[in-house]
Each structure stands twice: as structure tokens, then as C-alpha cells.
Amino acid sequence: MKKEKLASFIDHTALAPNIDVRSIVKLCEEARRYHFASVCVNPCFVSLCREELDGSGVKVCTVIGFPLGAVTSKNKADETTVAIENGADEVDMVINISSAIDNRFNNVETDISAVVDAARAAGKKVGRDIVVKVILETCFLSDKLIETCCLCAVRAGADFVKTSTGFAAPKDAEGKPLPNGATAHHINLMRKTVGKDFGVKASGGIRSAETLICMLEAGANRIGTSSGAKIYENWDESIIVKGRDN
């Protein structure tokens, strides 16, 4: 796969709470240099990224209701509107995870719809088509819940489903930490559920070319990673990614 093709899949990400302005500027410089799909940053950095990326073709992505998804739907909608007014092109929202676990899927869908509706309205005002990605936090959900939440996202009019925030801390019955990021199994399940024309984003724990390839081959068409520059710089263009136009 050519580096240019690789870059088109990557959301170059910096969401740590202690990230500084210098790091965000560097993130944008790397995204411009390598022509990544977007930078994904916390809402407070959206305006800065808009300025840094002006004219580059790189999108500005931010997060909504992040990382817990536990604020109200109105809070998420308002946050979405402000983010788009500040320059966001894409928003990655976290579902109400508690509602999903409780099988209150009307609440899950209504919550997603609130963000989608706000994004469409705000996008129309600023003259941009806004992409909405729905973070499921798959480490907390059974396969059946993942399937149902994917269908909620489709019905609500979103554009992508996404695996993880990367900030969850699941534990087993003995209190031992469990994996919290993307898995090939979950990506494959999500792709089969939403079909070929809907977006699937893998995020959380993707720090190597090997893991990135695994996610693409499982069905992801967007990758969220803070290691995008390292992966790009060390990429071997002779690599064949199955199921992709290399």
C-alpha cells in the first residue's frame, strides 16, 4: 500500500488531558506534511487546529461527550454546535453506555440523533458537510449490544461507528485490567452489521503498522491513533493490505 493511501485512513490523534499547545501545533504540522484524513483533538483546540490546517485539506475532528458519554443529550448537542462553529469538520461522540447496557436502545438512538441533528443544522449554517462518528466503547459491550448500537447509529443518520475512546478501564471479576481498545473481532462484527457503505473507525491501542493492518483487513476504513506519524514514516510500501486498493 502506498503511503498516500495509508495516510487517507488516519485520524492523527491527541486527546490526553495534559496535551499542550506546542504538541497540537506539531500534530497539525505532521498532518499537513503527510496528508492525514484529520487531526482529532479535544474541543478546546478546535479553533487553533482550524487556523493551523487552513487550506491543507486535512479535516478537524473533535470529541463530544468524551470520554464517558454520560452527559445529557442536550449537552452533547450544544457541544456539537459550538465545536462546528469553532471549525470542526467531524465529531466523534460517545454513546450513553449505561443506556446500552440497560437495553434502553430508544435512549441510545435518541442520544445519537441529538448530535446528528445538531451537526447537520450547524453544518448547514457554516456551509460544511459534517461527519458524525459514534463511539460505542466496545470493551464494555457484548457482541449483541454492539450489533444493536451499530443499528441505532445507522437509524439515527450517523456516518461512522467507532470502537473506543482509549480511556476506558474495564476490569474482570477479580479486578484485573482488561483490554480497552479496538480488536479485529469487534471491527469485523461492526462492519458486518452496518454493511459496506457505512464508516467503521478503529481506535484505542493502535500503535504499530501490524495492528493498523489488522484493523483495515477486518473492515475499518478509518484509524484513530496517536502514532500516525511514526507508522507513516516507517511504512513499507510493499505491504499488501488484503481487501484494500493498495
Model-derived regions, located:
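Conserved P-loop NTPase nucleotide-binding/switch module
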Residues: 237
